[in-house]
Amino acid sequence: MQIDERDNVLQRVRLFARSVTLGFVTSVSVVCAQAQTTPEPTLKIGVIGPFTGPSADFGVPMLNGIQQAADEINAFGGYLGRKIVLVKKDDQANPDVGLKLSQELVAEKVLATIGFCNTGVGLKSLDTFQTNKIPLIIPCATGSPLTAKYPAIESYIFRTSARDVIQAPFVVNDIVKRGWDKVAIFADSTGYGEAGLKDVETALTAQKLKPVYVARFKLGVTDLSEELKAAREAGANVVFSYTVGPENAVIARGRQALGWKVPQVGGWPLSFPSFVEGGKDAADGALMAQTFIAEPSNERRASFLTSYARKFNVKKIPVPMAAAQGYDAMYILVYALLGIRDNNLAGPAIKAALESKNKTYYGVVATYEQPFTREDKDAITANMLVMGVVKNGAVSFAYPEDAKRNLFVQRKQ
């Protein structure tokens, strides 16, 4: 395709997109498919995450969101007439399995990969993508080290989820305003818990506070009553938990069993079914950082939620953030590919395209004018966060003003 023809396509698409709720990149696929009718090989995109096992409650929604976006793009002719094929790998939330499967994705010559829900799993596999110059977009895992391991300018690691280094201070600032200044931190021993603990401690230090108690525990623990008693004796008036599994519910039920009526707060895992359903009424009132709450607050989000429910035959998404962030990641990737003028789909060219300022993508989580740059590989900024609260077995907005603000999709700051 000649440059002037591609520019003409983009201009037509931009005008068309204004009338299409589904989003900008879907319309890109419509017109680009018209511009190239000769059949081409497929585009292989890797998808890796925990699709079975205890982390599947957020791994499967991530996969579904990515699949939903890919299917929408393919329905309109794919990328320049080339169908997108997802090469799916189930890492089972196991770092060793994740590394092996990441190496398989490289061997299968995927153009890029979207995935990872567990920080520890992702950390063990980063070198595989970085060394082979294959862009990796992380739409789920939030551990701060994931996008900090390599110098930003050199890094092939991108992310569309909210890293914990912005989630932790967001929550800490809120609890301090509420007068909850004696914080007990409960963090698991995974890479996620380790990084999260440091982020919370840093956020507390910024408020001139220190945790009154810190508990560490392994995944799979079923009783934390002794640690909760120690936290109570230390004078804690809030529990900040950092774990991704049912251990959050263990903490909630433990507090309830002790009759210890202090709030539980944390990052986005407090919106997971393992906590909301596992903790039952003990989970009510818990506060957590969110980028996306499954309420049809505007036309874009309503369309996404309706399409997801119809496609996957569900009444509600188990972890809406994972689905929405995966969905946006797929579109951001395809949009970046469209920005490559010479059809060079080698890793360095895709990396450069992701870092470039392209036309605005109107996503579900955010409006992405330029999600990434050479110096910044995280698409989500603190202004996009809202506070969620568990209420009657569901997650909703903790503050009416957040619900009103959510009517307008945020942009990166």
Indicate where each model-derived feature is located.
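N-terminal secretory signal peptides that target proteins for export/translocation
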Residues: 1-15
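Extracytosolic ligand-binding ectodomains
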Residues: 2-5, 33-413
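N-terminal twin-arginine translocation
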Residues: 12-13, 30-34
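Hydrophobic alpha-helical segments, especially transmembrane helices
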Residues: 13-15, 19, 160, 309
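Bacterial N-terminal signal peptides
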Residues: 18-30
